[in-house]
Amino acid sequence: MSDSHARLERLTSMLRRRGVILPAFEIHGGVAGLFDFGPIGGRLRRRLKNAWLEHWSSHGNIVEIDSPTITPESVLIASGHVGEFNDYMSECIACNGAFRSDHLVEGFHPNPDILTADELNSIISENSIPCPSCQTPEWKSAQPMNLMFETRIGAMKGGRTAYMRPETAQGMFMLFPALYRHFRNRLPFGAVQSGKGYRNEISPRQGMIRLREFNMAELEYFIDPETKPAHDFSKWNDVTFSLVPDPEFGGPVEMTPGKASAENIIRHPTVAWFMARTWDFLVDVGIHPSKIRFRQHEGTEMA
């Protein structure tokens, strides 16, 4: 077991002992990827959520909304989730165990998330990676598996196909016309939402990092691309951020958000400003500044 996995195991064990998180439905055997928040965890989650909502709502032109967790199929077809919201799954020939292909090749590639099915198959085959359950190194070809939980709205025969939302963004985008009217047809404005999301993970692990039901908190901010924003970065003149760009464009840098915006390291001033405000929130809730970094997605990681 690696040091990072050992630390995660110790942390998860401590959280369980102290009533922060507990395995859900444990007396019936439990379900991987589902957790209860215990007496301490429930209070912590509520306080963190309230702090987050207050942090962004105090901005003035950001409002709170609450969208349904059941989403019609047509919405998720338009967003690309029905066709593309997939992880690759590898099935063991011997025991029929199913595992995420990118998890199997961790340690054999620096960024397994970006690999294609053929690349995953090659790494698994070339390294004779054993099945975590039965140790047999024989696998079927990696196949895409859609991660959304499907359901139906209405009677089963005439019901409308829908999904439990995999993220909160779609409901927020659907509300844009109403929000635009609320702000008297003027940009910029934003909306925040917190709530449940659902993903049918192939092989949940990493404690609370990969869950089948989880809590999300999201902000969407809408701007006029033709209007140059005027953000004041003076508050962060003495604060340097750890910025990790796409490796194609250079290595990590340390600089203030204002300088990063001026030098086009962060390509839009509004993005830089929200990164700075996010940094404020994280520090306010107790995260040490030295532990915070902002990493740009690589081109192959983009949704």
Identify the residue ranges that each predicted region occupies.
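TRNA-recognition modules of translation machinery and tRNA-sensing kinases, especially anticodon-binding
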Residues: S2-A303
